[in-house]
Amino acid sequence: MRIHILGICGTFMGGLAMLARSLGHEVTGSDANVYPPMSTLLDKQGIDLIQGYDASQLDPQPDLVIIGNAMTRGNPCVEAVLEKNIPFMSGPQWLHDFVLRDRWVLAVAGTHGKTTTAGMATWILEACGYKPGFVIGGVPGNFEVSARLGESPFFVIEADEYDCAFFDKRSKFVHYCPRTLILNNLEFDHADIFDDLKAIQKQFHHLVRIVPGQGRIIWPENDINLKQTMALGCWSEQELVGEQGHWQAKKLTTDASEWEVWLDGEKVGDVKWGLVGEHNMHNGLMAIAAARHVGVAPAEAASALGSFINARRRLELRGEANGVTVYDDFAHHPTAILATLAALRGKVGGTARIIAVLEPRSNTMKMGLCKDDLAPSLGRADEVFLLQPPHIPWQVAEVAEACVQPAHWSGDVDTLAEMVVKTAQPGDHILVMSNGGFGGIHQKLLDGLAKKAQNVTAY
């Protein structure tokens, strides 16, 4: 079959392209911007990429077009597909019909930690000899790709609540039919497609409804939003994580780089790994619980996490210059910002200076729906720098004024980088947070800090 994918350079759609290629299909695709690393990965798989959406790319006509959720009516390719009656479907629908139908699916859903937790679950199964398939919204550090078919019935998927396509506004995860389901947490997000928390809870409950009776749902007992969702009805086995639940994680070090796994009052494993932060400890515990459902002993799963490498942009060290370390993180919601800063504080200690640099870039952030929570979420930083995005209905100056620590802002990335470099002293830690490229600020900071060091040496 010849398959053409519209919007192929997103992590999810690129992952589907790799799976389709592995199944023996001829695969081509297009995107508005064909860019690395996805373009490089796809090129290696022998997948032809086309820049832009000129309708001529559909000649000769493919057997099937998979349409990404960024595509809208009016797109030349979308219009040609409809006009010529070319068979089409969404990415999640294709994944269900051609890959997941006969698999034991382990799905990881939730507002935060999906990529990390899915990566952990995949690595546990891999390290324990299960050779799982997977589709993850980032390239897990232990693998070179974001998706593969695998060689066993088990398939791990990052289950996103975003919608499927312009013709299917349900959350992607309703197509995945998991047997093992992790619900990490639930908060209001994606304000561009959800009106309120109840609308998200409704979609999450659709997911709960399709887990079989012999399936298992693993969720944190202290999450009130999930508790409300589960109260709408559950027909599957449940395992709760938390103080009053079946599973607990007990921290042995302040940065959570070492912790114990407890199940039903008994210690069943020890984790000593390269990650830090209680949020990662929580993610790891969820992954261990999910792996147990498919047959991995908790002690083996805990041991496997010792060699887990996270996906990029998860408290990733980008470099050091003039004695200042620069970290990058994908955090783009107050809860994630709070957790990431707490993790870094645990890592560097209570007296080291942390400088937080934030770009409010997600749709929810831009709409200002969580701006009142931003200043409190930045509380563990010693100094804050904020980028003012253009064309948003609120001012980051409001957040700067609400911060208890010194806080500054600029509408220009270069200016903001210069401000940070001027402030930063040897021994400081800079944490850059955004779900985008932030105008290449990481390298600008490292270059500026190196130049500052040279100037000091010159004197």
Question: Residue ranges of each PLM-predicted region?
Answer:
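Acidic, Mg2+-coordinating active-site environments of NTP-dependent enzymes
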Residues: 39-44, 57-67, 71-90, 96, ...
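Conserved motor-coupling elements within RecA-like helicase/translocase cores
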Residues: 149-151
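ATP-dependent carboxylate-amine ligase
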Residues: 1-34, 38, 43-49, 61, ...
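Walker A (P-loop) phosphate-binding motif
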Residues: 4-5, 19, 91-140
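Conserved RecA-like helicase motor-core motifs
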Residues: 28-30, 129-136, 241, 408
